[in-house]
């Protein structure tokens, strides 16, 4: 029950944030950079906790895995609006803007993989979770390889 409340709260909060954020433009490019980096930091934290389970460094706990997958899935749509024209910088490579179609396709692929990961995590099927985690992590890696400064 706590997990359902957390997911409901997180989803409602995200919808409110995305609706407001989509309407508002960032005042300064630095604001967009900070916003997207903050979203990615929270996602990376939750992803890292799941990764520890997949690697056998932490015990499998269905509720914890489901919670972290829900966090990542809820946040996955948010950072992309902060990569608009004039927001170059941070850890993003120029290819984000020069090859924006490829970047957009990579972001959509990641969001689909994260949705699958969330579905698998919520099901409680450990093997399905691990398989989906691997697929989702590959989409993250692919985007990092192509679009994030080393």
PLM features: what roles do these ranges have?
Residues 124, 147-150:
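Inter-heme linker and motif-flanking segments adjacent to c-type heme-binding CXXCH motifs
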Residues 26-133:
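Extracytoplasmic c-type cytochrome modules immediately beyond a signal peptide or single-pass transmembrane anchor
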Residues 16-21:
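N-terminal signal peptide c-region/cleavage motif recognized by signal peptidases
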Residues 136-148:
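The canonical Cys-X-X-Cys-His
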Residues 1-10:
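Bacterial N-terminal signal peptides that target proteins for export
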């Amino acid at each position: 029950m706590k997990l359902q409340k957390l997911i409901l709260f997180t989803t409602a909060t995200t919808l409110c944030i995305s609706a407001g954020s989509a309407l508002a433009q960032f005042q300064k490019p630095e604001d967009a950079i900070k916003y997207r980096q903050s979203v990615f930091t929270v996602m990376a934290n939750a992803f890292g906790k799941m990764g520890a389970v997949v690697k056998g460094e932490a015990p499998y706990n269905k509720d914890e895995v489901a919670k972290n997958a829900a966090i990542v899935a809820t946040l996955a749509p948010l950072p992309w609006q902060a990569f608009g024209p004039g927001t170059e910088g941070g850890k993003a490579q120029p290819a984000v803007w020069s090859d924006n179609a490829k970047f957009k396709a990579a972001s959509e692929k990641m969001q689909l993989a994260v949705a699958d990961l969330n579905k698998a995590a919520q099901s409680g099927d450990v093997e399905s979770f691990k398989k989906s985690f691997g697929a989702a992590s590959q989409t993250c890696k692919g985007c990092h390889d192509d679009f994030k400064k080393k």
